[in-house]
Amino acid sequence: PYELTHQGVSFTDPKSRSWKYFSDIPYPGAPEHFDESFRIIAANIAADRSLATDLRAQLTTEAKASLTRYLAANPGRKTIRSHFEAVSSWAKANGIGPDRIFLGEFGVTRTYGPYKASPPQPLENWLGDVRQEAEARGFGWAFWALSGYGGMSLIETDESVAFDRPTIAALGLKSR
């Protein structure tokens, strides 16, 4: 779900432009997380003094709708499992072995330095759930990047060569 994986990322499309102001989005998510999550998003929008009043109102409305959709879906491991089971069924019906299914990217932006996005626990939960469900079916996977925009990477910060330990742990990798 992009509301989780791309929180803090700037988009121009009206359906996703409010995601720039998303941060601290829970995963797993549920409707009862709405009030706290929306309070954080609304505060992020209000803090952007570059926005005209009407645009601020539009972004708040768009963010509310997007967050509502995300949380109403109850995103969690069960959701991932359901999607991966559908892929497994399709592959089996078409004579494609699980070793030929490759998950090429499933990163999450994270909070550090100038970036305001996911805190460690939701990021670890998401990465761990996706990786474990893929591995349980024999699917291959790769992570987005060694370093890169908004912490969607294995490296701790933009200026660092040190691994981000929560990311490494969630991926089942070991670092020295």
Identify the meaning behind each predicted range:
Residues 1-135:
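Extracellular glycoside hydrolase catalytic/binding regions
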Residues 112-176:
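Aromatic-rich peripheral "rim/lid" segments of glycoside hydrolase catalytic domains that contact
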